[in-house]
UniProtKB/Swiss-Prot annotation:
Record flagged with keyword rRNA-binding: yes
Basic and acidic residues bias: start-end ranges: 113-122
Lineage, uppermost ranks: Bacteria, Pseudomonadati, Spirochaetota, Spirochaetia, Spirochaetales
Any one GO MF annotation of this record: structural constituent of ribosome
Protein name: Small ribosomal subunit protein bS6
Gene Ontology annotations of biological process type: translation
Organism: Borrelia duttonii (strain Ly)
Family affiliation: Belongs to the bacterial ribosomal protein bS6 family.
Region Disordered, residue ranges: 113-134
Length: 134
């Protein structure tokens, strides 16, 4: 069955190593039947902890469609790519949002904001009482 996947890949930060590893990942994806690529480069970031003695890495997100039967073989091949530090492949789920839930949520936000505004504004009776006392 063909499913839509989203893969987050962490590469070494050096330009040449990054580009070669990214091309290798794309070749493996194509070899296992992935189609409809959408790439999004997040860029170079400092890592929270060292990964394979690297303190910085480049992130790349690739969305693709592929048969679910090939996923295990793909992951086995991705583990062999030298400059790929980490990867995570998730099934992308498109959820439908019902109109009733949106309307209900908007009403709740409106109601909550209205209550907050009423608490922030002093009531007229309190203002009149303060004036009479002075």
């Amino acid at each position: 069955m063909i499913k839509k996947y989203e893969g987050c890949f962490l590469f070494r930060s050096e330009e040449l190593e990054y580009k070669s590893a990214l091309e290798e990942v794309k070749k493996q994806l194509v070899a296992f039947g992935a189609v409809d690529f959408v790439e999004n480069s997040i860029g170079e970031r400092a890592l929270e902890y060292p990964v394979r003695k690297q303190l910085r890495g480049r992130y790349e997100i690739i969305e693709f469609k592929m048969a679910s039967d090939n996923l295990r073989e793909l992951e086995a091949q991705l583990k062999l790519i030298k400059n790929l530090l980490r990867y995570m492949i998730l099934v992308k789920i498109n959820r439908k949002v019902s109109v009733k839930k949106v309307k209900r949520r908007n009403f709740r936000e409106y109601r909550d904001n209205r209550d907050i505004k009423e608490k922030e504004q002093p009531s007229e009776s309190n203002v009149d009482a303060d004036l009479k006392v002075n």
